């Protein structure tokens, strides 16, 4: 039983209340975000992405700030509670007729169970995040092959075309089935071997432009921050909806950038061609 004592501690109580408050806070932010996104034209992916990401960070910071505030009020409460337990006759308890605007006190008896589930969940999701990150970083070290000289020359021209100052790395990889961009300071683009058999030069360049758009937008870093927030807020359905929207709009942002730099027909054909190897594997 000693192992579960923390679940009944003031700190666990503060965490449990923070989880409940987070659901209420995120519902308000979700509702505002949903309304705003509905009012924005479908073609404005950059604006939708910025609004969604900002809303998600507000939810995350609200959770952290609420938890810090709740924990900061614990020392006085804990000392007073212990003193009252030792000398109950020396204290008079005043009951106020007023109540806070939003109170979850009627759920207090469920908080130990709620906190236990949250801690188990965050350990699992943190482990999964760390594992996926390590697996991703290993991709840039194993099963790599250099591009042919003509494709490498095309790639370097595209890098200059979209004003990326430092050439990222690019390789064929035997470990993947779709293009991947990895890294922030030293980004690397990995391409599946099958891609060379299904794409024309123009289609190949369109796919490269999509990955270069991710590099130009520094999406790997922003996605990593988002993934950490996903781990903290794994319990929150309103946060999950916004996080899903962020990922969808991120891809649309890159698609819009590609359409500015290349022919829409070739890009559409390249996306269709990429589906062929995956369908054959299924």
Residue ranges with predicted function:
Residues 2-82, 102-282:
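Membrane-embedded and juxtamembrane structural elements of multi-pass membrane proteins
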Residues 1-2, 82-102:
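Low-complexity, acidic polar-rich segments
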């Amino acid at each position: 039983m000693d192992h579960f004592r923390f679940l009944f501690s003031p700190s666990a109580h503060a965490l449990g209340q923070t989880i409940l408050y987070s659901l209420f806070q995120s519902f308000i932010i979700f509702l505002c975000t949903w309304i705003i996104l509905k009012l924005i034209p479908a073609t404005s992916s950059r604006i939708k992405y910025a609004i969604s990401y900002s809303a998600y960070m507000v939810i995350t910071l609200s959770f952290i700030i609420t938890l810090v505030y709740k924990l900061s009020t614990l020392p006085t409460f804990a000392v007073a509670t212990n003193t009252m337990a030792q000398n109950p006759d020396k204290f008079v308890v005043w009951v106020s007729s007023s109540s806070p605007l939003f109170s979850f006190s009627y759920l207090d008896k469920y908080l130990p169970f709620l906190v236990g589930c949250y801690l188990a969940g965050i350990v699992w999701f943190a482990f999964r995040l760390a594992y996926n990150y390590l697996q991703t970083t290993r991709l840039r070290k194993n099963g790599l092959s250099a591009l042919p000289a003509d494709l490498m020359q095309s790639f370097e021209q595209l890098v200059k075309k979209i004003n990326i100052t430092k050439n990222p790395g690019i390789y064929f990889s035997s470990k993947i089935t779709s293009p991947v961009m990895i890294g922030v300071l030293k980004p690397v683009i990995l391409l599946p071997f099958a891609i060379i058999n299904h794409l024309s030069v123009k289609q190949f360049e369109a796919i490269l432009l999509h990955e270069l758009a991710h590099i130009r937008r520094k999406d790997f870093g922003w996605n990593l921050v988002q993934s950490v927030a996903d781990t903290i807020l794994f319990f929150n359905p309103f946060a999950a909806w916004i996080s899903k929207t962020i990922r969808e709009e991120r891809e649309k942002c890159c698609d819009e950038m590609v359409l500015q730099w290349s022919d829409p027909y070739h890009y559409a054909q390249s996306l269709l061609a990429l589906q062929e190897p995956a369908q054959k594997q299924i």
